[in-house]
Structure formats: structure tokens, C-alpha cells
Amino acid sequence: ELLIGTNNSGKLREIKALLPKNIKIFSTSDFNLKSPKENGKTFKENSLIKAKFFSNKSNLICMSDDSGLEIKLLNNQPGIYSARWGGKNNNFDKAINKVFKKLDKKVPNWKNKKIKANFICALSIYWPGGKYITKIGKINGSISSTKAGTKGFGYDPIFIPLGSRKTFGQILPK
């Protein structure tokens, strides 16, 4: 049994698809759990805050992540505030528009340049009793000048991984 510690339906769907079918998966909605306050200063800290909180509330092993987009030209913003850039309802169309507006303001002709970015994911697994593990992954890439693709969620339509011409939003998960 494993609790996926997220209230983000896109994340839940993608994580479930990656796990073996013999693991009984629970979501935070199965326990009517709201997300804890993410007051960490890093993706790693926020990932662990969520995993510990949800594990303690459910008494299950919990896997939680914290992930986001870091854009070099914007001093690594939105960073740990990636979801919050979408406002109260985590509206990623709004967040993407905010990225484009900030880039327009910083470098008016940014669409003709390669804007370096990273996608960061910290993943924590927390066991009842206090044992935990946290790992961090980073994908280098750039920002697309337009939204492209409908696969995935979040910033996927504007993040182009290094070595690709397509956004995450255009690439099927493997």
C-alpha cells in the first residue's frame, strides 16, 4: 500500500502510471486530506514536508514530490513557487502567461533567443515511524516561445528538454 501525497490530479495520474500494478495506491482524497503548508526553502524540504504530513495523517507509506520550473533569466523563478504562480487555483495557463510577461519585460526579443531553464523534481518517501528517503532530479532545457502540446500538465507545454525540439507537452511519457 502506498499513499501518493498530492492533490494535483495530473501528478497523481502520471505517478500511478509508473508504479507496478500490484501496489495498492491511495490518494490524499481517499483520506480527505488537504495539503500542508509548504514553508520549506527548497524543493527537497517541501517534498519531505508533504510526505511526512500525509504519512502521519494516514499511517501509510507516503510518496510526495515537489517540482517546478527554474528559468535562468528570471533568477531561477518561479522555482519552489511554480504552482503558486497560477494563483489560488494553480491555473497553469495563468502561470505560463506570467512567465511570458516576465520574459517580455526582462528581454523584449526573448522569443528569438534560447532561454535556459531546468525542471526540478524532489521525491520523498516517508514511512510511518520516521524513516525517509529523498532524491532530486533535474532536467536541463529551454523555454518555448509558444505553448505547444496537450500531454502532461503544468509548465509542460513550454519546457523543451535539452536535445529535443518538442515540449514536454508534445512528448508521450515513457
Model-derived segments and their meaning:
Residues 1-3, 9-173:
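Anionic-ligand binding patches
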